[in-house]
Amino acid sequence: MQQFCGVNVIAYYSTSIFRDGGYSLSEALLVSMGGGIINFLFAIPAIYTIDTFGRRNLLLVTFPLMAACLFFTGGVFNIPESNRDPRIACITTGLYLFMAVYSPGLGPVPFTYSAEAFPLHIRDIGMASSTAITWGFNFIISFTWPALRRSFGDTGAFSWYGAWNIFGFVFCYFLLPETKNLTLEELDNVFSVSNREHAAYYTRKLPWYLKKYILRKDVPPFPELYEFAANDGQYPQEKPDAKHIEGNNSVPPSADREVFSRTR
């Protein structure tokens, strides 16, 4: 999904995209350099947010925003070329916002996540394979971008990658567990859960999100993923409180004294 979000076609072809938008060659080169600077600067917060906000949450927030930026940029190409200033201003804004959103989310998260997803005994092979696959798709996407633009136009090409970002959001919501601040044992528990159970867990959690964040209700914490899976997709049964049991079964002090006096 890192490649299919469209970041590398923008990075590789930004100069030609800006030129088609209405910039001169020197202006397009300068504006392209600005996109690289934004990519660098907005990647810095990920040093902190990746372990505080979480890998999963970063992706769930940035995928819809990247999709919106690409749909917006693609739509701007429908503005007549005679309106040069608003056209190039909107194209620049859309692509700059895309890079700003990508950098703290889908930029660093996949590499961190893939390092945690593989068991220790195959982690080196897994990381090498995932990196090779990533750059293989990078070649395919960068090679096919000119043909995609010729076939579907600028609006269609940007919308194509915008649609992939929407797919990425759905995929991450239902199938991507959170791994921040987890020990190796907890990671094993999380990744031992099947995709079917994972999708069922987050399907059940949708009403909880609605009540807590939309309706602003006071709801109890939702059980952890591996606790949910260990109970066959049901909420873990609450253990009775020890004080509650003791209170129900305890003998009043007066009765204690009466029994003691009789035994004497």
Predicted feature locations:
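Alpha-helical transmembrane bundle of multi-pass membrane proteins
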Residues: 1-264
